């Protein structure tokens, strides 16, 4: 056989092997944990017992209730303690490790309760406080209908110092002040809007202490766009007492509106992005998951962490559709985005109703 013929045969065999490799999909290897569950990385197996424990004993049997709301709040209050100029370790668990310092910051009012609830789980399991806070937040959101699987990375080292004070935005701060603080931490104005999808499953205890557990929208147990709709409605009342710092009038009895949410929904820097979230569940889910993942990595070296995102449960499907509350019409919308029309929504039938407090608050 001539060298020319041999070369041609080798090329043909190489092409055939290459074609076969392309045609046969690679089989992704998965680790089987002691309890039979599988994950992409064996190091993630330690999370399954923690998952079972918090679903049963922190989240009351995998509910989307008060402890989920507070755990999600804690992810932000821990992570946003980060500034390239002012210091802070970001998502490092310092709010638990140095709780006697950080829970006394004015912006962290009331957060001592969820810190106290989570500390025994951190002590019980082989996990750092920084990892536990972000893991619990991601698991909690997955309990909510319409929720998302927030990516989770394992391996944050223990915090070495408390966060500086004054890094958590307050509800009475101006839009410019909030965007400046968030910009310092690496977030654009639109990412601030995306993060605020968290208020779809949130409530306030301390803005008006007379009405603890008052939600920010009418569906606090569902991760949906009602928060973005209802913050654009004309305010009619204060659900409790008036003249509370950081509170604006709400459209519904039993629903509280933060002054910061009211202003961000109407500010030229954020209004159109805010409106774009209305009745756009895929966008809310995708943007929130991506931005929460970014926040959860503040102050961390991602290359040193392990991707354990597949441990996070799949959330229940969204129930219900975007709507105006009963008794409201599109004329009640204070539209601040001139670039696009406000989405066409219908109102629930019946008279105006009130929103009950979040159970367990």
From Swiss-Prot:
The keyword Metal-binding applies. It is found in: Secreted. Disulfide bonds join 33-45, 44-308, 64-144, 272-337. The active site is at 77 (proton acceptor), 194 (tryptophan radical intermediate). It catalyses: 1-(4-hydroxy-3-methoxyphenyl)-2-(2-methoxyphenoxy)propane-1,3-diol + H2O2 = guaiacol + vanillin + glycolaldehyde + H2O; 2 Mn(2+) + H2O2 + 2 H(+) = 2 Mn(3+) + 2 H2O. Ca(2+) 2 binds at residues 200, 217, 219, 222, 224. InterPro entries: Ccp1-like, Haem_peroxidase, Haem_peroxidase_sf, Ligninase, Ligninase_C, Peroxidases_AS, Peroxidases_heam-ligand_BS. Glycans are attached at residue 126. It is an enzyme of class 1 (oxidoreductase). Its main location: secreted. Ca(2+) 1 binds at residues 78, 90, 92, 94. Its cofactor is heme b; Ca(2+). Belongs to the peroxidase family. Ligninase subfamily. A versatile ligninolytic peroxidase that combines the substrate specificity characteristics of the two other ligninolytic peroxidases, manganese peroxidase and lignin peroxidase. This is Versatile peroxidase VPL2.
């Amino acid at each position: 056989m001539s060298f020319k013929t041999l070369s041609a045969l080798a090329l043909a065999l190489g092409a055939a092997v290459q074609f076969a490799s392309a045609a046969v999909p690679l089989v992704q290897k998965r680790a089987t944990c002691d309890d039979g569950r599988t994950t992409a990385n064996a190091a993630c197996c330690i999370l399954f017992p923690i998952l079972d424990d918090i679903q049963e004993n922190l989240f009351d049997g995998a509910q989307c209730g008060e402890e989920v709301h507070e755990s999600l709040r804690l992810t932000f209050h821990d992570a946003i303690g980060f500034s390239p100029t002012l210091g802070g370790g970001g998502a490092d668990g310092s709010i638990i490790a140095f709780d006697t310092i950080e829970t006394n910051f004015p912006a962290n009012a009331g957060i001592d309760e969820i810190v106290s609830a989570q500390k025994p789980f951190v002590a019980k399991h082989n996990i750092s406080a920084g990892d536990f806070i972000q893991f619990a937040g991601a698991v909690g959101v997955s309990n909510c209908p319409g929720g998302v699987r927030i990516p989770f990375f394992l391996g944050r080292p223990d915090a070495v110092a408390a966060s500086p004070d004054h890094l958590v935005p307050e509800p009475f701060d101006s839009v410019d002040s909030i965007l400046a603080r968030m910009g310092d931490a690496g977030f654009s104005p639109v990412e601030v809007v995306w993060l605020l999808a968290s208020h779809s499953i949130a409530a306030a205890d301390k803005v008006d202490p007379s009405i603890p557990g008052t939600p920010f929208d009418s569906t606090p147990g569902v991760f949906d766009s009602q928060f973005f709709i209802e913050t654009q409605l004309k305010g009619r009342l204060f659900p409790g007492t008036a003249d509370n710092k950081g509170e604006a009038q709400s459209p519904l009895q039993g629903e509280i509106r933060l002054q910061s949410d009211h202003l961000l929904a109407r500010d030229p820097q954020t209004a159109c992005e805010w409106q774009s979230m209305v009745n756009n569940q895929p966008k809310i889910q995708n943007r929130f998951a991506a931005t929460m993942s970014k926040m959860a990595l503040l102050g961390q070296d991602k290359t040193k962490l392990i991707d354990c995102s597949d441990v996070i449960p799949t959330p229940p499907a969204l129930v219900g559709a975007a709507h105006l509350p009963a008794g409201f019409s599109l004329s009640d919308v204070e539209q601040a985005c001139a670039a696009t029309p406000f989405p066409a929504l219908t109102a629930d039938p019946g008279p105006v109703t009130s929103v009950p407090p979040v159970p367990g608050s």
